[in-house]
Amino acid sequence: MTELSKYRNIGIFAHVDAGKTTTTERILKLTGKIHKIGEVHDGESTTDFMVQEAERGITIQSAAVSCFWKDHRFNVIDTPGHVDFTVEVYRSLKVLDGGIAVFCGSGGVEPQSETNWRYANESEVARIIFVNKLDRMGADFLRVVKQTKDVLAANPLVMVLPIGIEDEFCGVVDLLTRKAYVWDDSGIPENFEVKDVPANMVDLVEEYREMLIETAVEQDDDLLEAYMEGEEPSIEDLKRCIRKGTRTMAFFPTFCGSAFKNKGMQLVLDAVVDYLPAPDEVDPQPLTDEEGNETGEYAIVSADESLKALAFKIMDDRFGALTFVRIYAGRLKKGDTILNSATGKTERIGRMCEMYANDRIEIESAEAGDIIAIVGMKNVQTGHTLCDVKHPCTLEAMVFPEPVISIAVAPKDKGGSEKMAIAIGKMIAEDPSFRVETDEDSGETILKGMGELHLDIKVDILKRTYGVELIVGEPQVAYRETITAMVEDQYTHKKQSGGSGQFGKIEYIIRPGEPNSGFVFKSSVVGGSVPKEFWPAVEKGFASMMNTGTIAGFPVLDVEFELTDGAYHAVDSSAIAFEIAAKAAFRQSIAKAKPQLLEPIMKVDVFSPDDNVGDVIGDLNRRRGMIKDQVAGITGVRVKADVPLSEMFGYIGSLRTMTSGRGQFSMEFSHYSPCPNSVADKVVEQVKERKAAEAKK
């Protein structure tokens, strides 16, 4: 087994098309894991192994790959850059100790790279920066370095400088060693020479080397003092300082190269070894109670502790069901019986594998620091904790965003319903941001997801992987309802039909709640007019109705219910009677509280070439967008806006038309906002028409 200090669990993340997957391919080639390099544009890359990924040239699932470099074991996760698949980024950041943030040398800090950077900051994942594609037209390393400061508020620590640019790019100067690494044009990564710094770069190299040293020695007071007195620190001392500053995210070591042309990659791999943390150098994962509150205990990263592992991904592939697991503490051996603390059930570990994209090598055991796949686990879902039967525990839960878009689907073949249900069940286990519901009125199957592309891919997987062809309805927006006025009201539930009856009277106030508060229940009852034992029934009854509002049947948000008084009968009152009273109170009073329809607002980030900015902004305004910011770059303008989701369907096609294919955009859910009356009326009418059409079927 590899020593814990020599593990590196890293993710590679960036904007769509910045070169993440190609970077991963080069890492695998250099570490000897693959012999022929797969190219993304050929549909042959190792980590993009789904048919949909190969065809679209984007990464959808986080593929996990193990490899070795200089006696260190890398567990590498290649994450998607498209915003519809950010759940994969969330998921992988949870189990990573460090990362490589890839930026395009010409595109710079693009919309999705900003989102991923924010997620990585929130997860406190140490990173190095790799500015890729320096062989591209318009590439400018130092411009991208400046963008990371200006746009991401990052502190990039320049470690190398490029030799040549665009077509002339041939290598890099290592600022620490003052050595130039120059590659030939064969595309073979090992074909390079180590030379002296080119004469025309000496002054620039010394300038940036001095900045590097000044930043690094701030991590060590003694070194800083010695440096101020004119003593130059050794390379080993500098590396130690850079490692410390990287781990605390004081700065981000920044490299450059061309993954596609195989130039500069070795220095990035060396940086992973030298600067990114081992599993026992990051803050340990907190343990929680059943409600998700931290207990004050932690999963100490050590093979000698009791087992604590997190199932972070479920996949169904040609080999069967795979559960990807990060082991935080303890050991796991083939044949062990472990506890799933979420279900309370035990499972016996059959086969365990070290993953290499869509291939695998079976292993007998694994321990703290490992990322592995377990074959054939039955009752495990993403986010479940796997632990020692004698030492139950729960790791901090994974939180996933709520879906904002839905489509109705039905199998083309009438006998395909069961096949579809089984397939969708497997897909939900794999992707927690993908949901399914059955419409109570129509009986239709409703698929919910994070965006058009997300659901498009799911329909494609159902067809190709599971052989289920679907009839797909128009995308539907996840509207919500709320109230805008306070109502003081009462309701009495009374039923007598011989024998003991049912009785429950409640007096209450409903009022608008705080934003994002959901449903809040309070009781100010005094004197026992409604005994305390019935309060939970009142809360349960009212809360159960929050899924169906009175305007158009959408879920209701942000309502506060206060139970103020009431009455009960010693014989006829029961929990069920008060629950029924609360349900009726909802129907009676929500309609009086001036209900309002809410629509999801998306945070939209658009890149437009300079000559199309006017068209792009005009189009966003027509879509009821509110422009928040415009940031000028070298190659175009970033426009940030809040836009209703209902106005964004088909936007990618419009943007491509307006910008001749050069525009890009990302969007993510921001908040719910009141619908204008004209929009609300239209939505209500559409719901009525849909229900009328369903009633005729």
From Swiss-Prot:
GO terms for biological process: ribosome disassembly. PROSITE patterns: G_TR_1, G_TR_2. GO terms for cellular component: cytoplasm. GTP binds at residues 14-21, 78-82, 132-135. Keywords: Cytoplasm, Elongation factor, GTP-binding, Nucleotide-binding, Protein biosynthesis. It is found in: Cytoplasm. GO terms for molecular function: GTP binding; GTPase activity; guanosine tetraphosphate binding; translation elongation factor activity. Residues 5-280 form the tr-type G domain. Gene3D superfamilies: 3.30.230.10, 3.30.70.240, Elongation Factor G (Translational Gtpase), domain 3, P-loop containing nucleotide triphosphate hydrolases, Translation factors. Catalyzes the GTP-dependent ribosomal translocation step during translation elongation. During this step, the ribosome changes from the pre-translocational (PRE) to the post-translocational (POST) state as the newly formed A-site-bound peptidyl-tRNA and P-site-bound deacylated tRNA move to the P and E sites, respectively. Catalyzes the coordinated movement of the two tRNA molecules, the mRNA and conformational changes in the ribosome. Belongs to the TRAFAC class translation factor GTPase superfamily. Classic translation factor GTPase family. EF-G/EF-2 subfamily. This is Elongation factor G 2. It comes from Shewanella oneidensis (strain ATCC 700550 / JCM 31522 / CIP 106686 / LMG 19005 / NCIMB 14063 / MR-1). The lineage of its organism: Bacteria, Pseudomonadati, Pseudomonadota, Gammaproteobacteria, Alteromonadales. The gene is fusB.
